[in-house]
Amino acid sequence: MYFEYGEKEISYLRQKDARLREVIDRIGHIYRETDAELFSSVIHHIIGQQISTKAQATIWRRMQETLGEINAQTVCNAGTQRLQSLGMTFRKAEYIADFAQKVHEGAFDLEAVEHMNDAAAVQELSRLKGIGVWTAEMILLFCLKRPDVFSYDDLAVQRGLRMVYRHREINRKLFEKYRRRFSPYGSVASLYLWAVAGGAIPEMKDCKPKKSEKKKAERQV
């Protein structure tokens, strides 16, 4: 299952921005896999924090093989130590066990989150241990398939903006300008900026100052 978008979103973004239009035309359609349901998506995102995609996939596969169906009951039954034995840190195992317990006891309502607006859903997900704003926003995009997720906390989105628009840095004010420009299809814009940040268009380079340049500039002030 992939994040779905089509001619409506592409036409809107192409008309809004000439440089993004060039990126879209060069890269073509992007297929990004999404999560089927919210409970497993939260766990999947906690596992993936600060590790490689390959390591995340390995731990997730072990979890599926060990628990079978991944739901609140099976995760609660597994417990923190067994979760940690799958290759994740003890802290992540604690976060996942705590989340499963809240869902099992009815203290966290997954269905309610699915029907909230973006801001409310991010706020509610961020109440969970181990889930910050950025992770909550990624869950909105890759599980709830919300169309207008454009995260200031996403370093790859910022890198993509620097590369496409030749900025040396992206401050909040500048970021908000692009957020407004791409809305209500910020999620699709994010897909293309991630692709650029990952090297999809080799001649686009990151204009962020190197540390040595930044220190030199600071000494001159």
Regions found by a protein language model. Name each.
Residues 34, 54, 58, 70, ...:
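Alpha-helix N-cap and coil->helix boundary residues
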Residues 8, 15-68:
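A positional/architectural concept
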Residues 19-23, 51-52, 56-129, 181-183:
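Alpha-helical ds-nucleic-acid-binding substructure associated with the helix-hairpin-helix region
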Residues 1-3, 36-39, 73-76, 114-117, ...:
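Short acidic alpha-helix initiation/capping motifs at coil-to-helix transition points
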Residues 42-47, 96-100, 139-140, 189-193:
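Short alpha-helical scaffolding segments that buttress acidic/His motifs in well-ordered protein cores
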Residues 41-46, 78-82, 120-124, 156-160, ...:
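A general alpha-helix detector
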Residues 1-30, 133-221:
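C-terminal accessory module of base-excision DNA glycosylases/AP lyases that mediates lesion recognition
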